[in-house]
Amino acid sequence: MGQKVNPHGFRLGITTDFKSRWYADKLYKDYVKEDVAIRRMLTSGMERAGISKVEIERTRDRVRVDIHTARPGIVIGRRGAEADKIRGQLEKLTGKQVQLNILEVKSPETDAQLVAQAVAEQLSSRVSFRRAMRKSMQGTMKAGAKGIKIQCGGRLGGAEMSRSEFYREGRVPLHTLRANVDYGFFEAKTTFGRIGVKVWIYKGDVKNIAEVRAENAAARAGNRPARGGGNDRPARGGRGGERRGRKPQQQSAPAAEAPKAEAPAAAAPAESTGTEA
């Protein structure tokens, strides 16, 4: 299942969050259509800006749009002219007041959408698809990612029949829900047709919401537990040994040694009463 489904939708509420955050009852379909139009407008004319994702939040009379980009200078423009133009287009599209936030992506080498876009740009420039894939994989692994997988599908190298090829380096656990797997997709337009580029980047495990809340509560109380488990872990192992049917001689051996351990306590009764108190 994890091999087929979109990693973002597969992990919603666990390691990823919604890209559109609003509630609507009767206007739900209109808002969904509006969100699609906003994202299409922002990504169609700004291929050079390196837009990673667009987040949308709505209130009753205002729309907040967050643009995550690797090159914020291109989106803002000279003295903010381009940003004002985008804000005017969004207000005309939505009919509401728009709050536009332009956020810089700190590490574009580990952003799956930007990596897919970079590979697609090289394919459009007639670079060999294998060279483009390996170059992007090397840059991502040097940037600190734990694993990456890149897949290209289409008429690779101008072949008559379309096919798909992928390269993988490191670990990419698609079935593990706690794994922080970023996913990106972009299409390269070539003279032979379109080539789809898919990128999966594994950045490490992320704790789920329940574990984070429990850890925060323990930190406030001042008794944060150790990660390895509590003191009752050896006892659990002993019970498991009994269930598996260990020999009775192994269980009776500690009981035979118990009186030897109690001998010093009998010789010094004053000390034993002090410890009991």
From Swiss-Prot:
* Gene Ontology biological process terms in this record: translation
One family from Pfam that matches here is Ribosomal_S3_C
SUPFAM superfamilies noted in UniProt: Prokaryotic type KH domain (KH-domain type II), Ribosomal protein S3 C-terminal domain
Under the heading PROSITE patterns, the entry gives: KH_TYPE_2, RIBOSOMAL_S3
* Cited Gene3D superfamilies: 3.30.300.20, Ribosomal protein S3, C-terminal domain (3.30.1140.32)
The KH type-2 domain covers which part of the protein? 38-106
State the function annotated in the UniProt record. Answer: Binds the lower part of the 30S subunit head. Binds mRNA in the 70S ribosome, positioning it for translation.
Q: Which NCBIfam families would you find in this protein's record?
A: rpsC_bact
Q: In its UniProt entry, what is this protein called?
A: Small ribosomal subunit protein uS3
